[in-house]
Amino acid sequence: MKKKIAVLLVTYGEVEQLSFTHLYPNAWRILHLITSRIANLPLPLKAFIALMRTLRRRKEWKRLRYQPKLAQINRKQTTALAKRLETVKQLADCEVQFIVRDAYYFIKPYYENVLNEVEAIADGVIVVPMIPIESDFACGVGCYLTLEHFGDGVFERVRVIKHLWNNSNFIALCVNHIFEKLEAHRERKVGLALVAHGTLIKDTNGEEPKVNTGYKETIAFYERLKAAIERDRRNSFASIKLGAMNHKFGGTWMTETLGRALEEFKAEGIEEVVIFPFGFLADNSEADLEAVMEVQQAGYPLQYIPCLNDSPDFIDWLAERVALSATQLVQPQTFRQTQIKKV
């Protein structure tokens, strides 16, 4: 009998329309799903913060004429993966059909609603967090909502694709992507800033956060990617640095910021800066707006290397990961026996 497997590409999501009716729910869900994990905010304060964030973002993005494209890229990723998985008809002697959907924490269609839709029609669910660095604020949100939805039966029907940051093939994919997109200016001394979302290292009480903020994973991913770039024969970067994009509130944030990287580049005589947002899988306002503006304001000539987005090599690799997880779902016993034989 054919097994139907739902594949959910889940990420934060950014609004596409800069209206109050789109921005305010977005800001509210950020506070509800993320901020509430580290701070217990009274309802009136939460509403006020969401309002201020909405008004500030609407004003700033309109002034800059910035049009968010994250959701559009996410849909392209979903379409490309669905098309690629159409070629997979059978796994472990079981006929399969993939149902691929995009889902979001902060914009519609909300992740929990998509879970409701696919539960009735799918034999299993594969969750693909489109954020390569794991933390309680990234894939942790999806895992929490999934556990809340499926309860004790979650492990029978759900698989989560994880540890992208620690996957050698994924890191090699990033390295190739960088050098394929890079416009080499050998007459200049070029620095590479590997950009990611910043993380908390201490809470407001000066103590280590009780939740996993993803700091250790961010550093490990950066160090592995940097080493792989430096080993590559195509490498001509004079300097490679981590560029974290921090927020202002919530405690003490990591010190390896993009601002510090730019200051160190200046001291090293760097003449041009290349940005690659390694901490994201799709271009978003933190990468193609905020990071770009910070480099430009520092006075550097800039090359922006896009995220992996819907690049064919990335989609092919992701499809392989999905197929492996699907094998575990449709034939768990067969999969275990296969792994034992390999060992």
Where are these regions (language model features)?
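Active-site-proximal alpha-helix that buttresses catalytic centers in soluble enzyme cores
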Residues: 2-343
